[in-house]
Amino acid sequence: MKKLSLIFLFLLCYSTSFAHYLWIETSPNGELNKKQEVKIHYGEYTYGIIEQTDGDAFKSVSKFEVWIINPDGTSSKLDLDKKEDHYLGYFTPTQEGSYTIQLKNDNIDVVDFTEYDFGIFKTYYQSFAKVNVSDIPTASTITEEGLSIKEIPTGNDEKILQIFYKGAAISEQEVKIYVSDLWSKTLNTDAEGKISFKLPWNTKYTIETTKNENVPGTYNGEDYEFIWHCATYCFPQSN
């Protein structure tokens, strides 16, 4: 019985760790020539888990890059400082329009979860956020690599997101919406790769979608069977 209890505890910890994700927090509205704050977190927001940057969990996914994509399509890498439970950076908008913030991390060691019937895989994290510096917001920018989440302006309190995989919209893609206190909702994309929903509470929402790319390869001398893609988007609490 004691052995079974230990196995259950280990599996619970494994499941919690595996469900972690990176996400970006920033104000959705910016101002010309005024510094914009950007934070990078790792954990599980709905469970109240925010990993410490000096902990092993965050260290294992800390080789990420964050890019600012300007309204004119040019981009620049964001410099980040390590804080206690997040990475912090700033950029200053100099153009009117919508800015896309993109995090990408495919520099993560291969993981062997064959014991748990998941296989041997390499993780590819991407996170997105949008900052409007205009009275007329436009859609955010997508990437041609992995999973992308694009926010489409609606002009009302409804949110529309479109999910892309390697630049193409994907239908029937499962998307999870999380808030604190273990509340979550699952939606599936339509034929155009879109989901729509409202934000009924003034709180932070994190959105996550994942996909397996069943192509084997090698990373840092370790073979893997597939790539596990994970993309996130965050709507911060309104001030």
Where are these regions (language model features)?
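Sec-dependent N-terminal signal peptides
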Residues: 4-13
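Sec/Tat signal peptide C-region and signal peptidase I cleavage site
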Residues: 13-19
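Start-of-domain marker
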Residues: 19-81
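Beta-strand-rich domain onsets/edges
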Residues: 20-39, 115-159, 168, 181, ...
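Short acidic/polar inter-strand loop motif in beta-rich domains
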Residues: 47, 106-113, 213-218
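Short amphipathic beta-strand segments in non-cytosolic proteins
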Residues: 64-74, 174-186
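Glycine-centered loop-to-beta-strand initiation motif
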Residues: 84-89, 189-199, 203
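Short, aromatic- and glycine-rich surface loops/edge beta-strands on solvent-exposed regions
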Residues: 95-109, 204-213
